[in-house]
């Protein structure tokens, strides 16, 4: 994919932190970036907070509110992986995700119009991708290899740097679970050889570990909320 920067915005929050927003679009041609004017409530990041604390995957979403006098049609798409955004705080990645598929349709009659742009995090967006074999055919692979493989399908710019696992369990006397648990990846295909989507594969791993997977910053975390009060260390 050839993602190119199309919009950016920078501002200070109430604590004087510098917030940078960048929006990219997959395009075969050359695009010129423009600056967006954000509203006072520019960014809202929401994490799933339902009653099921032990849910295997907890996703997040983001809303970016902008003011414009123009029709920003290139911010709208019917595809789930054509546009993504990054939000940084003081130069460090805070959140990234892909736009919610939608079509542009509105009339512009006022001087400034408020547009609310919706994005889903990288874990939620994995549902748009089907699992593929690591080695072009079925093989025994580690959980870590599976996770890195499915993330690489969506994260072409390698924004996700780390995978952390809560030191709640051990295998072979080590907390490095992901490199010591293996599976035949044929299990991610049905009898008709139809692949599961990558989000379901990640959920399978989280369930097997007995942990909850979530995304934050440049990392993915697996956490056992049962004993997080007693153990709060992680293996990278």
Regions found by a protein language model. Name each.
Residues 1-78, 110-152:
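Juxtamembrane "anchor/assembly" segments of surface/extracellular structural proteins
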Residues 19-23, 62-66, 83-87, 99, ...:
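Hydrophobic beta-strand residues in large extracellular and virion-surface proteins
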Residues 30-42, 95-100, 232-236:
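Short amphipathic beta-strand/extended segments with alternating polar/hydrophobic composition
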Residues 34, 44, 88-90, 198-206:
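Short, solvent-exposed secondary-structure boundary motifs
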Residues 37-38, 84-119, 211-216:
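Short beta-strand and beta-hairpin "edge-sheet" elements
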Residues 66-70, 89, 100-103, 121-123, ...:
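Short, flexible loop/turn elements at secondary-structure junctions
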Residues 74-88:
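Short coil-to-beta transition motif at edge beta-strands of beta-rich domains
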Residues 108-236:
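Charged- and aromatic-enriched interaction segments used to assemble
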């Amino acid at each position: 994919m050839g993602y190119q920067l199309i919009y950016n915005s920078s501002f200070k929050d109430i604590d004087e932190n510098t917030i940078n927003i960048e929006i990219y679009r997959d395009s075969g041609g050359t695009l010129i970036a423009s600056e967006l004017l954000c509203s006072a409530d520019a960014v809202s990041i929401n994490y799933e907070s339902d009653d099921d604390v032990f849910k295997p995957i907890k996703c997040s979403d983001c809303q970016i509110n902008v003011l414009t006098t123009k029709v920003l049609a290139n911010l709208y798409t019917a595809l789930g992986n054509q546009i993504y955004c990054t939000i940084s705080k003081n130069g460090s990645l805070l959140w990234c995700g892909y736009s919610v598929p939608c079509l542009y349709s509105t009339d512009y009659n006022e001087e400034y119009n408020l547009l609310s742009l919706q994005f889903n995090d990288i874990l939620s967006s994995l549902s748009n991708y089907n699992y593929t074999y690591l080695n072009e055919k079925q093989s025994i692979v580690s959980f870590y290899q599976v996770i890195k493989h499915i993330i690489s399908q969506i994260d072409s710019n390698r924004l996700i740097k780390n995978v952390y696992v809560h030191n709640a369990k051990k295998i072979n006397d080590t907390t490095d679970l992901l490199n010591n648990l293996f599976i035949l990846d044929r299990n991610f295909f049905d009898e008709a050889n139809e692949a599961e989507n990558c989000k379901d594969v990640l959920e399978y791993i989280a369930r097997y570990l007995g942990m909850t997977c979530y995304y934050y910053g440049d990392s993915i975390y697996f956490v056992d909320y049962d004993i997080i009060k007693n153990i709060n260390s992680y293996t990278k």
